[in-house]
């Protein structure tokens, strides 16, 4: 069903201060361009180039990726149709690598898109920090820093499906984060599929209420230091640490099952583990696999699961616990089809904007 959604934006641009622009990105064949509507193979990059900090880029779903993009010293939001959209859309908002360059790229947010990698500080010519990054309701392969000269500050990755491809070091990894001042990885589903490199590499991370799944023989952590690992489920993948490269980590209330090494490292190299459980978490349907996540799988805990209300905070271990439990559909956004507004905007006068959108 299509609806016309009239929005009255009160005191729109009433001062000379910065104003937010919504830009529509549609690379589907035959898409029609217009004011703040970008089409063609480079639609997303063109929209980024035209944007200023604070702008929102709405990526229309399609079958062809919008390709790799670079955001240089702009604080932008990229929104897609949702993590696993319903209503028979059958397509996703697809993007390649997202490269963030420069400290003014702080405040970047991505929600509801399927992308390859987030590469913060991909071109780090001097010491800077990109901060306040939010990745939510997305599917992606990895978050990776290419340089230890720069840093990430206050990044949150939540309610995502992470398939752990395209590592730069010894194998495919989900996270390679060298220098940070606050990275929270919470309520995600994370694939483990390499026996020579864990999927998490970093220092000072907080890792809570995730599901790490695999095929029974692989481990999660490599060169992970001074991190908090709490309320996670390790299904057919090992949380055991290599104490030569992993030091000073605190594990609290995690559960492991079905791995070749169902153990938690405690009392070695400054690593500690308390409240851990070695038992089947009784997930409804998560098979033994190293393949990418399939959305027909079901992470719901069955009755009698030892992970129910067993987290340090009294909620479930794994993605169904914590403050914001995992929602496989993510936050579904309406599919914006057209935005109509006057060609001339008078300062200090209310502006009426008509948005035509299709429900999701």
Tell me what each language-model feature is.
Residues 1-23:
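Bacterial Sec-dependent N-terminal signal peptides
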Residues 26-65:
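Acidic Gly/Asp/Thr-rich repetitive segments characteristic of extracellular carbohydrate-active
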Residues 28-31, 61-64, 81-85, 237-238, ...:
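Acidic glycine-/aspartate-rich tracts in secreted/extracellular proteins
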Residues 57-59, 76-81, 111-116, 133-138, ...:
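Well-ordered beta-strand segments characteristic of repetitive beta-sheet solenoids
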Residues 72, 121-127, 146-149, 155-295:
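Predominantly extracellular beta-rich ligand-binding scaffolds that present long acidic/polar faces
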Residues 75-125, 143, 165-166:
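Right-handed parallel beta-helix/beta-spiral solenoid domain characteristic of secreted/periplasmic
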Residues 273-329:
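C-terminal accessory segments
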Residues 315-351, 358-360:
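Short, compositionally biased P/S/T/A/G/V-rich stretches that sit at domain boundaries
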């Amino acid at each position: 069903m299509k609806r016309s959604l009239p929005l009255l934006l009160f005191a729109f641009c009433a001062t000379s201060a910065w104003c937010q622009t919504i830009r529509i990105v549609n690379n589907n064949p035959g898409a029609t361009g217009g004011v703040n509507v970008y089409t063609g193979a480079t639609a997303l990059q063109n929209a980024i180039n035209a944007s200023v900090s604070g702008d929102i880029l709405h990526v229309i779903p399609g079958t062809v990726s919008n390709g790799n993009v670079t955001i240089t010293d702009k604080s932008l939001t990229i929104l897609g149709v949702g993590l696993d959209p319903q209503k028979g859309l059958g397509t996703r908002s697809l993007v390649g690598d997202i490269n963030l360059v420069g400290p003014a790229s702080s405040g970047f947010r991505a929600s509801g898109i399927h992308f390859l990698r987030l590469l913060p500080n991909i071109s780090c010519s001097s010491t800077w920090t990109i901060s306040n990054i939010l990745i939510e309701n997305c599917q992606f392969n990895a978050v990776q820093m290419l340089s230890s000269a720069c840093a990430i500050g206050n990044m949150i990755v939540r309610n995502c499906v992470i398939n752990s491809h395209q590592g730069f070091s010894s194998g495919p990894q989900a996270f390679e984060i060298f220098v940070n001042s606050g990275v929270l990885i919470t309520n995600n589903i994370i694939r483990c599929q390499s026996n020579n490199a864990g999927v998490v590499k970093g220092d000072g991370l907080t890792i809570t209420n995730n599901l790490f799944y695999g095929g029974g023989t692989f481990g999660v952590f490599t060169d992970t230091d001074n991190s908090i690992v709490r309320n996670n489920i390790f299904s057919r993948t090992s949380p055991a640490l290599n104490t030569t490269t992993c030091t000073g980590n605190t594990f609290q209330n995690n559960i492991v099952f079905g791995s070749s090494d169902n153990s938690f490292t405690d009392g070695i190299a400054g690593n500690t583990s308390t409240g851990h459980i070695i038992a089947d978490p009784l997930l409804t349907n998560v098979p033994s696999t190293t393949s990418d996540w399939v959305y027909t799988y079901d992470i719901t805990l069955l009755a009698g699961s030892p992970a129910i209300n067993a987290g340090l905070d009294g909620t479930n271990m794994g993605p169904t616990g914590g403050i914001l439990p995992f929602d496989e559909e993510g936050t579904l956004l309406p599919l914006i089809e057209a935005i109509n507004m006057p060609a001339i905007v008078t300062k200090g006068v209310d502006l009426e904007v008509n948005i035509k959108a299709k429900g999701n």
